[in-house]
Amino acid sequence: MAPVVTVPENASPELVEKAKNLASVWQLNFDGNVRHGLVLMQSEAHLALKQLDEPKVGEVLVDFASDALTFRRLHGGGKKEAVAKAVGLKGQSEWRVLDATAGLGRDAFVLASLGCRVDMIERSPVVAALLADGLERAHHSAELSAWLPQRMRLHHGIAVDLMANWCNEPANLAPDVVYLDPMFPHRKKSAAVKKEMRLFQQLLGPDEDADGLLAPALALAKKRVVVKRPAGAPFLAQQKPHIEMQGKANRFDVYLIN
């Protein structure tokens, strides 16, 4: 069951109306009086996923101007960063990348900051609403507004279907790279899972149909498909990649297109 959209206590009529419109756009329910459970909280500042029963967990939002992402953008290693190497950005600029499992959009943002034009697909209306809110606020950011709107686009829908439709478009519109980072079930011993992962798992659960993403991705991409997996996780669809890039916590499996 999807969380309801709500507002803080004593919200202005304008904010209530904004929240109701948001609920309508994403086909979610609005309840201005809810005080328990997992909600989408529309405040004056931003939209956030929040567990009202666990105030210590904090909230999850998309903030492309956050200190963490700003540091990563400015000092994260640029094209030497692992995701950039996996995508194959060395010597390339303005590659088209399709992030078919966008989530909170962090890897998409890093790739966009390096010059890629990134289309993001997100099937969850709740997560898509968070992404849309983050993109909207980025449009008004002095540091981001000059380039981010031209390089990041959001599509809400089922990735397998959208990729299949994309294959029917002219070849010049196909992405150079399809990037996949499906939700993977966390091991039980990982009690200190990051707050957003806890809330995301509560909201979405693991991508049980993730294996079905690989074939349409391989059919669509012009250069390569990159799959981000936890270290030690099986290959997607049990298909061995051409390149494995091992990290401490994650692994990038790279499938080259001949």
Curated annotation (Swiss-Prot):
Cross-referenced InterPro entries: 16SrRNA_methylTrfase_J (IPR007536), SAM-dependent_MTases_sf (IPR029063)
Keywords, alphabetical: Cytoplasm, Methyltransferase, rRNA processing, S-adenosyl-L-methionine, Transferase
Disulphide-bridged cysteine pairs: none
Signal peptide extent: none
Transferase listed as a keyword: yes
Domain of life: Bacteria
Gene3D superfamilies: Vaccinia Virus protein VP39 (3.40.50.150), YhiQ-like domain (3.40.1630.10)
Positions annotated to bind S-adenosyl-L-methionine: R106, D107, E122, R123, D181
First-tier enzyme category under EC: transferase
Record EC number: 2.1.1.242
Function according to Swiss-Prot or TrEMBL: Specifically methylates the guanosine in position 1516 of 16S rRNA.
Family recorded in the similarity comment: Belongs to the methyltransferase superfamily. RsmJ family.
HAMAP family hit by this protein: 16SrRNA_methyltr_J
Protein name, UniProt field: Ribosomal RNA small subunit methyltransferase J
